[in-house]
Amino acid sequence: MGRPWVGHESWELVDEASDICGRDVAALLLDTDAEELKDTRNAQLTTFVSSLMVLDAVERLGIEPSFCAGHSLGEYTALTATGALSFDDGVRLVVERADAMHEAGISSPGTMAAVLGLDDDMVEVACRRADSEVWVANYNASGQVVIAGSVDGVASAGAVAKELGAKKVMPLQVSGAFHTPFMTSARDRLRKAIADASPRDTEVPVISNVDALAHNMGDEWASLLSAQLSSPVRWKHCLITMSELGVTDFVELGPGGVLTGMAKRTIEGARTISVATPEELDKLIEWVNAGVTTTPLQVEGEHLFAVERLVVSPAAGVFTPVGDMTEGHSINVGTILGNVGDAEVRSPFAGVLQAYIAVEGERVTPRQPIAWLRAH
């Protein structure tokens, strides 16, 4: 899972995560086999750290979101991305969450299954007709719903779903009935840990799995994150909410690539891209640039146009500009504007160089503005 990132600047997060949680995260990412990763205590930690490595690399390019959302565990990544949680708190909460869910899975054994090709309301009918402990756990996309509960309950609801017209019912290799009342003990255990982390208010809202609404007040997340464990993930509704808020471009960060397909199925005309490895960063830069438009902004009756772009530092260190790059120089996507130490400063945008903001020899910090561009 993590091998492509070895040697990349963002790999430093792996060492930080190991120090925080007292586990060898590098070994988990590089040496753990598929069977061991089925253990939710391993899967959640490795997925979270992997996603944060991708996020860190993307932030070094100066690319920032308007909204964030994450599916299940991914909600912790989204909250860390917006600054609601620090990286330290994110790691600690993910470890606590995984352990709580593992224990709940032992005390209340259960399973999950994906129901394909059946409307949401019919899947809900199937769960009710099963007359057993089974519920909808994930509303992923149109015709893609996950159910969870007791082994007998999931089997019974799956059979009813097929009778109602489901194209396929696929058992999932999981260690519990997540996002159902079977996780009540985990929910109660996690609530205090989240409150103790004191999530912060954020400028960038996060769309909650529980209610599919945008939230940026830190004090709301103790109840939302804990409730998420025993409530269905309303992912389809989160996507619809973002679309209604004007989002047209969706970037999936981290291993898997599954959410990109869900966005395409749910939002007509959505632009999507998935980024999981360093090799895909250049592709992301090109994708972002292809979607750049001059967006009119209403300011006191006048139309201004959002064409200004800042290129930021990918790392801390001493800045050295490219010698022949001057004001008025035409910049393409990926053009090298200079170096910060050994790290190249590449422009994620096309445009015309207006000025360098950092001067030669200046010691800069990560994400400090380096240059100012005006988009073509």
Task: Describe each PLM feature range.
Residues E59, K162, I240-G246:
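Non-catalytic positions within long, well-ordered alpha-helices that form the structural scaffold/packing
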Residues N138, P321-G323, N339, A355, ...:
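A residue-level detector for short acidic-glycine micro-motifs
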Residues P296-A355:
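Acidic, low-complexity mobile loops and tails
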Residues S18-R23, D33, T82-S230:
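Alpha/beta catalytic cores of group-transfer enzymes, especially the acyltransferase/condensing modules
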Residues M1-V123, K168, L172, D249-P278:
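FabD-like malonyl-/acyl-CoA
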Residues R271-T294:
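Short, flexible loop segments at boundaries between secondary-structure elements
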Residues G74, T326-N339, E360-I370:
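Short, well-structured beta-strand-loop connectors
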